[in-house]
């Protein structure tokens, strides 16, 4: 398939630049992957859609305030977007400046040069930096960092984003983009779903800035997926096995939860074992033709045209059904991308 097969026209005004006043106030488009039928509703409908005995899988990563502003030794301005923390002092980052800093030079971070870091080496599009401070990189980010809003939101971050560009159940710092399907859940809705008899499980996938990188090839088979760190612990494996045994469904909240679970499934298949825990980097690229191993239903936001994520959804619900649902969403003025509306999709099994 060609990347252009996943194009759709999106009016600029449908890109959500701010969240709704309440997390659960977003709209929800239901899609049946077998029939292609769509149904308009509100996100609170999730409470009716999740059944007793189902397992809802969330990504508990925490978005770090990964964007820092500073300057080079020469005085030129720069912007640093942390991609991954290697340890408490060393990190990989995207660096934007008029001229790339050279290895061995210092950069000063913060509005008032509060901190400095040494440029250690360049790794493709990323730079390895070493923080010169008696604090950890996480502590420095919490002090001077900005929330790394996606480029299409096209505005500076605001104080409210520290709360709203973060799920209420986040636990493990490391993401530089939010697992956005989870942004729609508040604590009340979570409690109501649990009270129905559904179970919860938590995976971790630290979403990288690569999630916003455009696909730069024409043939999707030639695309090389960016790497992200994921964890599927033993208790999640046990919960999935128990759910399948009782006839319940595995409902993944977000494409990052899907990619975590399916990474564990693929690794186990490769090793010829039953489902095992997974800890490590994943480059899993899911597109039409992929056979899902674990996930039965998917809650997800609306994704960018020609992105790997709309390809993942197309593999889940069927290409035609997905593209038709997106046309319906555009025609009915759904809000798109990170702060936008959501879908509840039942997997295509026929």
Curated annotation (Swiss-Prot):
GO terms for biological process: queuosine biosynthetic process; tRNA wobble guanine modification. It is an enzyme of class 2 (transferase). Pfam families: Queuosine_synth. InterPro entries: QueA (IPR003699), QueA_dom1 (IPR042118), QueA_dom2 (IPR042119), QueA_sf (IPR036100). GO terms for cellular component: cytoplasm. Pathway: tRNA modification; tRNA-queuosine biosynthesis. GO terms for molecular function: S-adenosylmethionine:tRNA ribosyltransferase-isomerase activity. It comes from the Bacteria. The keyword rRNA-binding does not apply. It catalyses: 7-aminomethyl-7-carbaguanosine(34) in tRNA + S-adenosyl-L-methionine = epoxyqueuosine(34) in tRNA + adenine + L-methionine + 2 H(+). It is found in: Cytoplasm. Its EC number is 2.4.99.17. Keywords: Cytoplasm, Queuosine biosynthesis, S-adenosyl-L-methionine, Transferase. Transfers and isomerizes the ribose moiety from AdoMet to the 7-aminomethyl group of 7-deazaguanine (preQ1-tRNA) to give epoxyqueuosine (oQ-tRNA). HAMAP family: QueA. Monomer. Belongs to the QueA family. This is S-adenosylmethionine:tRNA ribosyltransferase-isomerase. It comes from Vibrio vulnificus (strain YJ016). The lineage of its organism: Bacteria, Pseudomonadati, Pseudomonadota, Gammaproteobacteria, Vibrionales. The gene is queA.
């Amino acid at each position: 398939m060609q990347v252009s097969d996943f194009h759709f026209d999106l009016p600029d005004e449908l890109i959500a630049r701010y969240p709704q006043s309440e997390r659960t106030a977003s709209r929800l488009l239901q899609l049946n992957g077998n029939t292609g039928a769509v149904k308009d509703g509100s996100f609170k409908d999730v409470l009716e859609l999740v059944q007793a005995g189902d397992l809802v899988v969330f990504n508990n990563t925490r978005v770090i305030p990964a964007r820092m502003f500073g300057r080079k030794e020469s005085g030129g301005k720069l912007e640093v977007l942390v991609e991954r923390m290697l340890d408490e002092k060393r990190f990989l980052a995207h660096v934007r400046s008029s001229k790339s800093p050279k290895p061995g030079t210092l950069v000063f971070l913060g509005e008032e040069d509060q901190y400095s870091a040494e440029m250690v080496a360049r790794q493709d599009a990323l730079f390895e930096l070493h923080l010169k401070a008696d604090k950890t990189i996480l502590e420095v980010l919490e002090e001077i960092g900005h929330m790394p809003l996606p480029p299409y939101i096209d505005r500076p971050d605001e104080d409210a984003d520290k709360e709203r560009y973060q799920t209420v159940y986040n636990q493990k710092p490391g993401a530089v983009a939010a697992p956005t399907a989870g942004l729609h859940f508040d604590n009340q809705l979570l409690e109501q779903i649990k009270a129905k008899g559904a179970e919860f499980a938590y995976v971790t996938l630290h979403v990288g800035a690569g999630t916003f990188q455009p696909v730069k090839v024409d043939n999707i088979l030639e695309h090389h997926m960016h790497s992200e760190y994921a964890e599927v612990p033993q208790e999640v494996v046990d919960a999935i096995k128990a759910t399948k045994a009782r006839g319940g469904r595995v409902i993944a909240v977000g494409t990052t939860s899907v990619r975590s679970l399916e990474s564990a499934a693929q690794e186990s298949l490769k090793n010829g074992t039953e489902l095992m825990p997974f800890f490590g980097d994943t480059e899993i690229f899911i597109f039409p033709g992929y056979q899902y191993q674990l996930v039965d239903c998917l809650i997800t936001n609306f994704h960018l045209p020609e992105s790997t994520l709309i390809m993942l959804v197309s593999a889940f619900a069927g290409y035609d059904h997905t593209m038709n649902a997106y046309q319906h969403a555009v025609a009915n003025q759904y809000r798109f991308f990170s702060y936008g509306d959501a879908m509840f999709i039942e997997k295509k099994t026929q």
